[in-house]
Amino acid sequence: MRRSMITTSQAARDQFEAHGAAVYRFAVVLVRHHQDAEDVVQETFLKFLRHLDAGGDTTNVRGWLFTVAAHAARDRQRRRTRWVPWRPAHDAQVPPPVLPDEDGRLKSARDALRRLPERDRLLLALRAQGLSYRDIAAAARIRPASVGRLLARAVDRWEAATGIRKDGQSYDLLERHSHPGAR
């Protein structure tokens, strides 16, 4: 029993090292607050550890982690709409991290992303993380056949809001804005 717990714990730690930063960047896009994103990551990997302990399937760990993170973020956002969170006064004095943005495109992209509906943010963030349409469908709780159409609409709305051309820059900016120092 003790040996299997160590093996399970090490497997969870290995997956955290492999996917933790990407899950965090994804969570920041969805919950829009770094502390909440950290909570989503912690909740996701705790569930993953329990999943491993229960002998759960590990054939698509990355997809599983992003699906659980999406659900945790959605649950957190629902709770947030019911309760106004208390933030200590010193939180308001800490400025958000500043990323290099010489021509304002990054700020424009970030602002446009924040204004999008939750499902659009979710779809864009999942795609930016490289998940398959099947995994995106599972995480977003939509039919796999609908992913392409809904994702295209989300990209169109985001690009219309930012004025960014459809030449791949959109996804690059989405990934760059997600976490300071990422890429």
Where are these regions (language model features)?
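A short, charge-rich alpha-helical start-of-domain segment used by transcription regulators
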Residues: 1-25, 35-38, 49
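C-terminal flanking helix
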Residues: 20, 24, 45, 117, ...
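Structural recognition of an alpha-helix C-terminal capping motif at a helix-to-coil junction
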Residues: 25, 39-46, 50, 59-71
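Hydrophobic positions on the alpha-helical face of helix-turn-helix-like DNA-binding modules
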Residues: 44, 68, 123-124, 136-137, ...
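Arg/Lys-rich amphipathic alpha helix in sigma70-family domain 2
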Residues: 53-56, 67-88, 102
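DNA-recognition helix of helix-turn-helix
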Residues: 70, 140-168
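Internal acidic/polar
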Residues: 83-106, 132, 173-179
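Short amphipathic alpha helix immediately N-terminal
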Residues: 116-135
